[in-house]
């Protein structure tokens, strides 16, 4: 449903009928700030706490390049109008009495897409936002939310649709109680899924395809090749560095590889990708992907469904014969920083032992931009 202003009056069910259809996709924007829930955290603040001892050395005053720190009533005071938030005073205080804080959502955003509105509440600049979801998971007040398809998915369950769960390899770290693939499969079937498939299988296919691309393109046509599995990274690279867009591999993502493979096996079935990243929802809403991936759930949304269905994972009967063993360790390693590049480089090394492929990796969008 679309977000509305607090002073806008509408029927509670307005728009519900349009959103209840089983093949509803996301209307942009995907990630939204819930304004009335926002705590209006300061964007950046350097402040002297009560731990200040009023020391005679006052190194904080000496290192401040803007002379923003003065001595009043036996303690240091920072003039916020002069302070440039450089943090030098924070580093030299012997009592750790000066703290530097930043709005958590803005600090987590690698695109610099979050600022304040006229009332001090967080606001997203959608010309910069790539829907990575980092602001969403880092807001301590739960004031940022993404749109979901839980309602549409449950409609499919109730109709008896054959819905396959396509699970990203990162599930092991997200669900410690479902660490075995057999238990994961049992839990997903208990909530209504017809069957469960590892997206790591699609990652293996992606590795082979991307390795072929690399051998054909680099260095004859391209100086380097960038991986394409993360839609947030891909969008950031194309937006911030348009001249390098041609260097991003055109290989399909593991999600799409897996969905298309399962659609070929069972054309009437529907596919639900389950993973840690909200950006996959954006990818699934693309016209070229819609026919392959019907639903996308984050791990948080899946946890909510398991909780709502009262599935006690400790009591699940596990048939180890049905455990997921088809994917390789390299495919499951896609979830790690640099995992895709390593898998591709290892595959090339397997085919061409004498070829030296140099790889580089980064953690988070801010590092990727560097």
Please state what every model-predicted region is.
Residues 39-47, 70-75, 115-116, 134, ...:
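Gly-rich Lys/Arg/Thr-decorated short loops/hinges at beta-loop-alpha junctions or inter-strand turns
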Residues 53, 82, 98, 128, ...:
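Charged, low-complexity surface patches
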Residues 1, 146-370:
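Iron-sulfur-associated redox domains of electron-transfer enzymes in respiratory
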Residues 50-66, 84-95, 106-111, 127-141, ...:
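Local cysteine-cluster metal-coordination motifs and their immediate loop/turn environment
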Residues 43-47, 127-129, 266-274:
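Immediate flanking context of iron-sulfur cluster ligation sites
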Residues 79-80, 85, 93-95, 104-166, ...:
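Conserved Radical SAM active-site core
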Residues 1-92, 96-108, 368:
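Ferredoxin-type iron-sulfur electron-transfer modules and their immediate structural context
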